[in-house]
Amino acid sequence: MGKTITIADDVYYELVKMKGKKSFSELLRELIGKKKKGNLDVLMIAFGTRTPEEVEELKKELKEVEEWMDSWTPASL
């Protein structure tokens, strides 16, 4: 069953840009999954369960995400 949520216009426009041909549900599932995976990665690093190669790959991915987020500009209303 579908649910209705209310979000700010600027958030809506950013989600529209991000989703491409996906549904909003697909996009939100993907973002939630990344957040959960991100939390697991933090725990794995904290407890030293990553190989040096995995740590380097994570650093690369984090840099890419940081650059991607820096490229965002607030939507004009």
Curated annotation (Swiss-Prot):
Pfam families: VAPB_antitox
HAMAP family: UPF0330
Protein's UniProt keywords contain Iron-sulfur: no
Entries under NCBIfam families matching the protein: PRK13696.1-2
Name the UniProt record assigns to this protein: Putative antitoxin TK1752
The organism's taxonomic lineage, starting at the top: Archaea, Methanobacteriati, Methanobacteriota, Thermococci, Thermococcales
Keywords carried by this UniProt record: Toxin-antitoxin system
Signal peptide, first to last residue: none
UniProt similarity note: Belongs to the UPF0330 family.
Job description of the protein: Possibly the antitoxin component of a type II toxin-antitoxin (TA) system.
Provenance organism: Thermococcus kodakarensis (strain ATCC BAA-918 / JCM 12380 / KOD1) (Pyrococcus kodakaraensis (strain KOD1))
Keyword Ubl conjugation belongs to the record: no
Top-level taxon of origin: Archaea
InterPro entries: Put_antitoxin
